[in-house]
Amino acid sequence: NEQEPNEATEIVGGKVETVEVSRHPEASIPETDLSLADIERRRSHPLRWALIILAVLCAIIAPYWFGRSLAVNNTDSIVAVLGGVSPQGIALVGWVAVVIAYVGLAMAVVVSPSWPWLIVFVLGLACEQFIAGLSMLNLNFWYSTYVVYGKQAGLANAANLGIMGAAIGIAVYALVFVGLLVIIRKTSPLNVLTKSWASFILYFVIETIALLVVLFGGLLTTV
């Protein structure tokens, strides 16, 4: 019995033609003893992720406790260095540290290669945690700052408000962005608001509003 030709229809030179296809094409992927699980494990780079997680944990823990130790043991030196800085300037520094950390993390997610932005994220996080340690950031920070800094507690409180303002800005942005993803249809002209560049603009608008509230909303004189 003659085997029927193995044919396929393709567009060649703008015309529809029937071409013969080999029944046993040569494999384009070389043979390997690795299983699919082994291949996926290599692609996942577990060592790289372990180093990233370790770096993040170090950036969270070490700078905070170092800053806190300086605040407790070298209070006079810190007050002498920062005494001439306005509360608005201190709040701005805390806000900038959080924004840099978040932008580094966000860019690491959307940009390849991601490692330069991961470095930015870790450094920004370390700076934010160091400032948080110096300013005794916790849920009742105004008591801690008054005990440590006394009449100069306003400077530490300003740093805490800058950090918290930026963190609240991130939370508000996340809620707004998720809401846009849920409400706006893909066919809607407003879908442009869900693009990465538009989401970054939205983030900076929200963060700017949060900063203005901290600087000029009366919070620096209240806490």
Regions found by a protein language model. Give the residues of each.
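Juxtamembrane boundary at the C-terminal end of a transmembrane helix
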Residues: 211-223
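N-terminal juxtamembrane cytosolic/stromal segments of multi-pass membrane proteins
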Residues: 1-56, 80-82
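Transmembrane alpha-helical segments of multi-pass membrane proteins
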Residues: 52-56, 114-136, 195-209
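Membrane-proximal helix-loop-helix units in multi-pass membrane proteins
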Residues: 117-182
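Membrane-helix boundary connector in multi-pass membrane proteins
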Residues: 176-197
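Membrane-helix interface motif
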Residues: 63-77, 130-148, 219-220
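Canonical alpha-helical transmembrane segments
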Residues: 84-120, 180
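Perimembrane loop-to-helix junctions flanking transmembrane segments
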Residues: 71-90
